[in-house]
Amino acid sequence: MIFPPSPPTLGVEWEVALADPHSRDLVPRGHEVIEKATTHLEREFLANTVELVTSVCTTVPEAIEELREGIEEVKAIAADMGLKVWAAGSHPFSDFRKQPVNEKGHYNEIIERTQYWGNQMLIWGIHVHVGISSKDRVWPIINAMLTYYPHLLALTASSPGWDGIDTGYASNRTMLYQQLPTAGLPYQFQSWDEWEAYMADQNKSGVINHTGSMHFDIRPTRYGTVEVRICDSTNLRELSAAVALTHCLIVDLERKLDRGEELPTLQDWHVAENKWRAARYGMDAEIIISRDTDEAWVTDELRSLVERLSPLARELGCYDELQGVLTICQTGASYQRQRAIYKETGSWLPVVDAVLAEM
């Protein structure tokens, strides 16, 4: 893989879906929105989905403003079609068996290969790209970012419902997506050469021929970025906080390397446990924070991160967005709001209404 060095620029991909405000079910008309929009939109795996894609941005506010303008256009087009826009990690009752995949050879091949699990990918996420100055820094930074996996997932967890039930998870999307053979946690490679050898193996074995790429939760890209794919899709306010935290964390890690500091890491088994805890318990997760298996509440860790990173956030122009992390800690994440409504009403319909209203 070619990896061109990049300054710490930023790009964001935001997956959203179309919903019928009467039935509250999903509607496979994403291609119609894309055809009418001037905003940069991409087709995604599902025909009900559109993906908003920013340009290469220098600051979080710049990226968020592009997304704000884009989502307003998408909402207006959807409204003309009698539809609304859905932004969450999954849908609480839409039948994945009845939601068609986009007609694209790559996607159809994934379905053919993965069968039952591939058909269940009724999920949406947020992908954040941050530029990295050297390919030799990519894997130290990715391995360090894995220590912050539960922080980012808990903030955005928005998929408690699935197939008509409360799963008990904050992010059922996370549990579903890892069922695909090329998805899930990356291996903690120790060098760029080791990564290239791994990718050569995947090419030789035909894995990449079937899937187009590896779909790790954090991965390098040919654009000179590290792509963080941890977060559930959610509303723009909570997305802004997660993007700001991601940008600050990666820039902070780059600067630690500049100073010759060793970056934090966790054992693979701790990383996997933290991922599960955040998916299960969200903002109520107790997470592992050291190689000695010390633990802390994810909300306490988030507050500490905001305090530590706030000076850097001012420098990067995303101080206000980073403070949104504290708001989520105080008022709750999307999955908590959804679950509270479901427990109160016993129905997913008002839950869908509430999520649609947040857009």
Curated annotation (Swiss-Prot):
Q: Name one GO biological process term.
A: modified amino acid biosynthetic process
Q: What is its EC number?
A: 6.3.2.2
* GO MF annotation: an example: glutamate-cysteine ligase activity
Q: Which domain of life is it from?
A: Bacteria
Pfam families the UniProt entry points to: GCS2 (PF04107)
Q: Does the keyword Ligase apply?
A: yes
Q: Which UniProt keywords apply?
A: ATP-binding, Ligase, Nucleotide-binding
The UniProt entry's coiled-coil ranges are none
Q: Which InterPro entries match?
A: GCL_type2/YbdK_subfam (IPR050141), GCS2 (IPR006336), Gln_synth/guanido_kin_cat_dom (IPR014746), YbdK (IPR011793)
The record's catalysed reaction(s) read: L-cysteine + L-glutamate + ATP = gamma-L-glutamyl-L-cysteine + ADP + phosphate + H(+)
* Role this protein plays: ATP-dependent carboxylate-amine ligase which exhibits weak glutamate--cysteine ligase activity.
Q: Which family does it belong to?
A: Belongs to the glutamate--cysteine ligase type 2 family. YbdK subfamily.
NCBIfam families, sorted: gshA_cyan_rel (TIGR02050), PRK13517.1-2 (NF010042), PRK13517.1-4 (NF010044)
* Protein name listed in UniProt: Putative glutamate--cysteine ligase 2
Supply the source organism for this entry. Corynebacterium diphtheriae (strain ATCC 700971 / NCTC 13129 / Biotype gravis)
